[in-house]
């Protein structure tokens, strides 16, 4: 978009993000409890359905709308982490294993299952650019006592294939 012509992104929850000459990111995954809008440069305005007030962001800010409470909060954003995907990167900064699993699942179109409550306590800081899923999992295994098992897609009776699956458990 440019400064004179706005570009709107609407989510199914009635959130509209209007951009004016800007670089921004909106995350509105159905399975996630929050909707996030992050501004890298330019100007965005966020409107909620049935709300008269709108929220404006300045570069470096992120608005987080809770689907549960239907409240919005603005906080400082880590732009490296929030916008890395557009350059094909996966960037994690003290990121919990559960969030890493979600991002790897989306990025590589696989089903990742975490087994064992201690797995959820692990956090990682890493940047991945050209690594394959197998390479990333191998690196994760080297830095924590975990084991990653990759289960390749299987053909079912209806000739469809299952999704590739990864099971991560404690060693």
Segments from the language model and where they lie:
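N-terminal export/assembly leaders
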Residues: 70-171
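Short, small/hydrophobic-biased targeting/export segments
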Residues: 1-70
């Amino acid at each position: 978009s440019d400064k004179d012509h706005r570009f709107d992104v609407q989510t199914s929850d009635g959130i509209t993000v209007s951009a004016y000459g800007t670089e921004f990111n909106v995350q509105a995954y159905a399975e996630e409890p929050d909707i996030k809008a992050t501004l890298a440069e330019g100007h965005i305005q966020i409107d909620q359905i049935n709300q008269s007030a709108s929220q404006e962001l300045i570069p470096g800010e992120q608005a987080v709308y809770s689907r549960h409470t239907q409240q919005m909060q603005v906080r400082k954003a880590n732009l490296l982490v929030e916008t890395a995907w557009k350059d094909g990167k996966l960037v994690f900064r003290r990121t919990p294993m559960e969030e890493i699993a979600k991002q790897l699942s989306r990025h590589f179109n696989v089903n990742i299952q975490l087994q064992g409550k201690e797995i959820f306590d692990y956090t990682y800081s890493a940047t991945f650019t050209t690594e394959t899923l197998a390479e990333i999992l191998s690196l994760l295994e080297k830095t924590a006592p975990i084991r990653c098992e990759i289960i390749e897609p299987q053909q079912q009776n209806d000739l469809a294939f299952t999704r590739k699956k990864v099971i991560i458990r404690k060693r």
